[in-house]
Regions:
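A glycine-rich, hydrophobic/aromatic-adjacent loop/helix-cap motif
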Residues: 2-214
Length: 214
């Protein structure tokens, strides 16, 4: 029996987008939608190199977040570059369930639990926990990348649950769609942008967004 290590990554932000992760980080794998218990998603990951605030996570016993489980060959140089403001922390598989009983995710999680010595799941935990501001803003094109990834999951209300389970929308969010500032954006159509804005309005967070340059 092979003892080769199998690595998995919890993608809870821009890695939700198959387009973004394949083009910018060479991660090619199917979507396996999951829910991770005991972690809270937050706009608190200050990116020093790109002058932005991205998504990060904190351990909070009562919290949960929806995400995608990604099978990766290794924590590659491309992935480390993408996640340079984070550390890779191992996650207990018992805290993860398949989103809306996704058969693919269920089967993969069962295999992971059956092989704890060779199958390891990691989550990227941000090194800095600082709220966004005008110098380190939240980019709309980053949000678009996350939400088109949610749309691709094929799970009802996955995008709405992403918004609901994300904290600290209130500061430093700018609309950069006319001049993309996020370094690893997904391809997003105008129709998808409209869907995203409708969803953000329904979830009562769109009011916090400012136009770039204002």
């Amino acid at each position: 029996m092979s003892t080769k290590q199998k690595h998995y990554l919890v993608g809870y932000g821009s890695l939700l987008s198959h387009d973004s992760r394949s083009r910018h980080s060479n991660i090619f794998c199917p979507n396996m939608p999951i829910v991770v218990n005991g972690w809270r998603r937050e706009w608190l990951a200050r990116g020093m190199a790109h002058l932005q605030t991205a998504l990060g996570v904190s351990q909070v016993a009562t919290a949960s977040l929806n995400a995608v489980l990604l099978r990766i060959e290794q924590i590659s140089p491309e992935l480390r570059d993408r996640e340079q403001d984070y550390q890779f922390i191992e996650v207990d598989p018992s805290t993860i369930v398949a989103a809306q009983e996704s058969e693919l995710a269920q089967a993969e999680l069962a295999n992971i639990r059956a092989n704890p010595d060779t199958c390891k799941i990691f989550i990227c935990v941000n090194l800095n926990k600082i709220q966004s501001n005008s110098q380190y803003p939240i980019y709309q094109t980053y949000i678009d990348t996350c939400l088109v990834g949610c749309f691709d999951m094929g799970v009802a209300n996955f995008a709405a649950e992403f918004i609901q389970s994300t904290h600290f929308w209130e500061h430093g969010w700018i609309n950069d769609r006319h001049n993309t500032l996020y370094a690893k954006p997904a391809m997003v159509t105008q129709q998808q942008q409209q869907q995203i804005d409708t969803l953000l309005k329904q979830q009562q967070v769109l009011e916090y967004r400012q136009e770039a340059g204002l």
